[in-house]
Amino acid sequence: MAYTHVQTFNPEILYAFDPLNEAGNCSKTHSHNFLEISILLEGEADYLVDGERQDVGIGTVMLFNPGVKHAERQKEGTFSHQLHIGLTNVSLNGLPRNHFPNKRALLDLGCYADAFMEKAWRVTKEFNEQRSEYQLMGKGLILEMLGLLLRSLEDGSDNTLPPALSQTAVRQQHLVNHAVYYLENHHSEEITLEQLAQQLFVSPAHLSKIFKEATGLSPIHYLIHVR
């Protein structure tokens, strides 16, 4: 199945950074209300994911959906170089907002692993060097990485969740996606809630309710955020 609509799929990159972790470094157990991808570029690390410890090495890719608790530490005599990417405004067909269809955080990319890691290193270079248009270049690479992740989850993986939304929720998801698309492409114009609702053939009250449930913002506050 196709998880994305090219016209409306437009994730927001919250951060992309690549820390060097020395022995003794650790993070407390935490979770996010957005997507996070963690990639082991070099070295090894000890991760705790939903209460289960895992030793991970070079090439390991973990994708933490919202609410997935995780922590990490560096054992004595070890180090790691990791890339962490935070993403929001991610909408995939049949799934709750900001969720990917993986059952487990630890991913097996199979034949896509080499291409994925090559792009991860390029993302690291773009965000570290910050040359002209690095954010655009970085976003393009991250979109390709997301495409590879989705392909790996579709190709016979036992780590793939089935669509979790009802037909009503799917219709609401499409409505929110098109509202977001319209706001992002007309943000310089004067737009009222009534005008937006008219464009989408729904009532202002209904649009406002489902938009805020999906994004945490009202349509007009989202427009202000985009501006």
Q: What residues fall within each predicted segment?
A:
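Generic protein-terminus/edge-of-domain signal
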Residues: 1-61, 68, 74-76, 93-106
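Short, conserved glycine- and acidic-residue-centered signature motifs
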Residues: 33, 172, 176, 224
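A short hydrophobic beta-strand segment most commonly corresponding to one strand
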Residues: 77-95
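Amphipathic alpha-helical segments enriched in hydrophobic/aromatic residues interleaved with Lys/Arg
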Residues: 98-156, 181
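Cytosolic nucleotide-utilizing catalytic cores of signal-transduction proteins
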Residues: 133-138, 168-174, 188
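Short, Lys/Arg-enriched N-terminal segment that forms or immediately precedes the first helix
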Residues: 159-167, 215
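Basic/polar phosphate-binding segments, predominantly the helix-turn-helix DNA-binding elements
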Residues: 178, 182-226
